[in-house]
């Protein structure tokens, strides 16, 4: 099968995007894998620090490899939002295909310093591990929000020059810039619109060897997704939307059969709900 780097490069050339979806258990993983097989595209599984603590890094790696073999499609594993260098190193040691060093709350200099340390460790590990970093603050929530958090300033965004300098100074393979996006989903309305021209400028500035990653994809309109991908984003993260679908499917199953106590008889409804969301997103990202 193709490597993650080859998959991302191909997506960039074809102006499509690879979907990245977070999991907390094997049930969600199976729903995502089934959707990717149906659409016929590779997919990336993400596990945040909290999700890694719950699932276990080595277990997440083993589950992902097993799912890729079972479903017959490329499935890759990413250590999502690691806030420490040691966390990234641990994920690399556990066999992850990609890691994200999230240093946006550090000073710009410290963010670059720690990101570069992760890049250097990845280059020496004996495998082709993708290293991603974040540039600009878009919040930390994965919940339904009443409004944009006060600490997220949608107009204070990094420039294309900032993006190019960060890539040059750190050597990252992928960059997730703030472009008007937001972690979490706003209740009853779409998330703020993206700065499409800024994405185009950043794509030009960082070059064709670096993936541009859209975080905070949950809550965006289909039109925003398409415009962002056309402008140069070749990897899209979805998490909150998956969590809402999973919980909703399980709650619906228990409401229909409140006496049910066998987990496999109601958890599968959550899996099916996840599969539906992922299928729709993958079809959109790859069209």
Model-predicted regions and their roles:
Residues 1:
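Active-site-facing substrate-recognition patch
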Residues 4-14, 26-51, 58-74, 81-209, ...:
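Alpha/beta enzyme core
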Residues 19-24, 77-82, 209-220, 238:
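Histidine-centered catalytic micro-motifs
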Residues 220-287:
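C-terminal alpha-helical cap/extension of soluble enzyme domains
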């Amino acid at each position: 099968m193709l490597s993650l780097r080859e998959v991302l490069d191909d997506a960039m050339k074809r102006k499509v995007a690879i979907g990245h979806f977070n999991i907390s258990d094997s049930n969600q993983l199976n729903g995502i894998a089934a959707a990717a097989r149906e659409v016929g595209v590779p997919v990336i599984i993400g596990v945040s620090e909290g999700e890694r603590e719950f699932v276990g890094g080595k277990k997440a790696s083993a589950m992902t490899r097993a799912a890729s073999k079972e479903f017959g499609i490329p499935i890759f594993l990413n250590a999502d939002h690691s806030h420490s260098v040691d966390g990234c190193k641990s994920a690399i040691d556990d066999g992850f295909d990609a890691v994200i060093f999230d240093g946006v709350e550090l000073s710009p200099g410290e963010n670059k310093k720690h990101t570069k340390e992760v890049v250097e460790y990845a280059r020496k590990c004996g495998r082709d591990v993708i290293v991603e970093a974040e540039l600009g603050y878009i919040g930390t929530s994965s919940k339904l929000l009443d409004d944009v958090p006060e600490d997220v300033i949608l107009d204070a965004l990094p420039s294309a020059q900032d993006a190019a300098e960060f890539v040059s100074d750190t050597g990252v393979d992928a960059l997730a810039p703030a472009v008007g996006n937001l972690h979490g989903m706003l209740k009853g309305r779409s998330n703020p619109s993206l700065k499409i021209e800024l994405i185009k400028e950043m794509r030009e500035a960082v070059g064709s060897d670096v993936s541009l990653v859209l975080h905070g994809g949950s809550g965006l309109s289909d039109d925003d997704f398409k415009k962002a991908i056309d402008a140069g984003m070749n990897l899209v993260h979805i998490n909150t939307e998956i969590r809402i679908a999973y919980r909703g499917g399980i709650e619906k199953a228990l409401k229909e059969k409140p006496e049910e106590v066998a987990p496999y008889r109601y958890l599968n409804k959550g899996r099916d709900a996840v599969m539906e969301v992922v299928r729709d997103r993958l079809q959109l990202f790859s069209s």
